[in-house]
């Protein structure tokens, strides 16, 4: 685990050095969490997208494609719940002026406890040698059990608080755990507030008459609103699927992890419509089919 950040830095360096990914607008100091796919990166991305499209659409008689617009009527996002619920719980540190996702701070706290569990296991492995039984040790060692109970308790409370939109309790949990700013060590926190992840824009000739729109945060809604159009014009019978690839946008405040969490990204998505009562059958089918596809890319 200690080598993971260094390995990740090497991957990022390699991606830039060999023309796969560049920082967007780099000559103007760049733009956080926005990247350009370079000469080799775009070819790799194009190959994966075309391979995906052939496997998902062209090789299946009951799956068709769609290219929905990025702009959609704002009621779409109200009906889908994105306007009211597509949020991240954010908290600011008053001293460092840095903003964090409250749930990530708590998850990082739990990750540190996981590290303590790993250390206990390694110590026991070294002590007992070949006779060491990892599963038995984890289920019987009082310290490990205590650590596990702590993690379960913290994550359970956080989950319930977020589900109930009790942001005061999320802050209380951070304070009770004495979670500090990762940069300064300060524990001087603001209240937790919900921040909507959709980018807003305007449609119209003037500011007064312009309609408020959003850059789509996902491609799925374009499929859902076109369901009847596709079904009627394509004479599709359930079960059938609609696939789409395209840009999506999310205003990630705490963006990190290189191209794995970007503000502008591309999705490849299939929505498969089935008859009630056949969920398990189709879930197993697609789980196996998609796993085989990913393994065919050498991801095993």
Question: PLM features: residue spans?
Answer:
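TRNA-recognition modules of translation machinery and tRNA-sensing kinases, especially anticodon-binding
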Residues: 2-300
